[in-house]
Regions:
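Central regulatory/effector-binding core of bacterial HTH transcription factors
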Residues: 1-36, 95, 101-102
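Flexible hinge/capping segments at coil-to-helix
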Residues: 35-73, 77
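Beta-alpha-beta core module
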Residues: 34-46, 60-62, 106-156
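Generic preference for hydrophobic
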Residues: 7, 28, 40, 50-51, ...
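Alpha-helix/helix-capping structural signal
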Residues: 13, 55, 79, 106, ...
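Secondary-structure junction motif
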Residues: 58, 62, 70-92, 159-167, ...
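Thr-Gly-centered strand-to-loop micro-motif
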Residues: 52, 75-76, 96-98, 121-122
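Well-formed, non-transmembrane alpha-helical positions, independent of function
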Residues: 17-18, 42, 65-66, 88, ...
Length: 173
């Protein structure tokens, strides 16, 4: 079938607003979004990956408690990935001892490459974001932090059945 894809990136809150107001047909987001007017279709689990300076490649991988004591580089407030990373470190309302913010994953990874700190990024971003930086990547110890990625659309969307078929194709591939 003909499909006119027009991808765009935005924070989850804006995507949800655009969905509910009819400006978007569907969005790939971290679940749950808990919006009653939206259908959520879980697609896959995505792991968080630690990015640290290349010089730390041979050091033990830190656990959440150790991460709290390191200079942690996170996305600015409003990004759901920031909240998910803080939740993994079990920081609650307390921020890491030494926190710095960046506006994008690219900025955070370049800051890590410059030796400023460490960060967590989604597994699907590792290949692109780390290819030109002097960094090492590592899986965190179990239980590994992750999030569910899903396709979301308005329950009233006339394309709902087609979107469910697309979601199932993504999920099974």
């Amino acid at each position: 079938p003909e499909l006119d894809l027009r991808p765009r990136e935005a924070i989850t809150q804006r995507l949800v607003e655009d969905l509910t107001e009819g400006r978007l047909d569907a969005a790939l987001v971290a679940l749950p979004v808990s919006e009653p007017g939206l259908t959520e279709y879980p697609l896959f689990e995505e792991e968080f990956i630690l990015v640290r300076p290349q010089s730390d490649a041979d050091k033990p991988v830190p656990n959440p408690e150790t991460l709290r004591e390191m200079r942690l580089l996170l996305l600015e407030e409003g990004h759901c990935f920031r909240e998910q990373a803080i939740s993994f470190c079990k920081l609650g309302s307390a921020l890491p001892r030494d926190l710095m913010e960046g506006s994008s994953l690219t900025t955070l990874v370049q800051m890590v490459g410059a030796g400023i700190g460490v960060t967590l990024i989604p597994q699907m971003a590792v290949g692109i974001e780390t290819r030109s930086a002097a960094v090492s990547v590592a899986r965190l110890p179990a239980p590994r932090p992750s999030r569910m990625i899903g396709l979301v659309w308005r329950k009233t969307n006339p394309l709902g059945s087609q979107l469910a078929q697309i979601a199932e194709l993504i999920r099974t591939s």
